[in-house]
């Protein structure tokens, strides 16, 4: 789970207006709300909104978006990628091939080991302008037919293909975030 410190370090400075009418937003909210879990932080008024299809633990492969509600409004959309395997990669960059277009991101990766010799590496990035993970990147994945990712490590690499379910989950989260009034910001 993301720490409050991580969110606090990524304060937006400029908002972008979204093209959702009130009626479209209400219809989208009714459509997407059942696809998500909401977990309230007992020490603040933060509510974590995560797709029901997202892995519950770090020691699982996964890719998804989620966001936090604060004061009843959605806060920065986030992109999470989790790698779980037998071999360390020490991921330094990731190349996403989205319907034939390559987009490179330089994620801020965390690593851990355990679980009978297995390892896991993950990134959790704010979706904001000025980052390599911005709204255009998420929109491309959300509307893609095919997404492959090459994780370039310090000595090795691995490739994965996003499933149709993972792509749909990113699209659902993106649309739900916008329907709730979520804004994309510049840092």
Which residues does each PLM region occupy?
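A generic "folded-domain core" signal
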Residues: 2-187
């Amino acid at each position: 789970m993301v720490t409050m410190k991580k969110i606090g370090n990524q304060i937006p400075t400029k908002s972008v207006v979204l093209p959702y009418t009130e009626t479209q937003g209400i219809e989208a909210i009714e459509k997407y709300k059942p696809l998500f879990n909401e977990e309230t932080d007992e020490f603040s008024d933060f509510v974590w909104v995560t797709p029901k299809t997202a892995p519950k633990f770090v020691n699982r492969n996964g890719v998804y978006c989620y966001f936090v509600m604060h004061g009843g409004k959605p806060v920065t959309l986030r992109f999470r990628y989790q790698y779980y395997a037998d071999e360390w990669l020490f991921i330094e960059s990731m190349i996403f091939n989205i319907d034939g277009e390559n987009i490179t991101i330089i994620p801020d990766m965390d690593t851990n080991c355990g679980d009978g010799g297995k390892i896991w590496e993950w990134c959790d990035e704010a979706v904001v302008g000025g980052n390599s993970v911005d709204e255009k990147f998420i929109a491309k994945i959300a509307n893609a037919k095919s997404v492959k990712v090459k994780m370039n490590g310090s000595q090795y690499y691995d490739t994965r293909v996003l499933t149709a379910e993972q792509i749909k989950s990113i699209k659902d989260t993106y649309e739900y975030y916008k329907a709730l009034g979520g804004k994309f910001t510049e840092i």
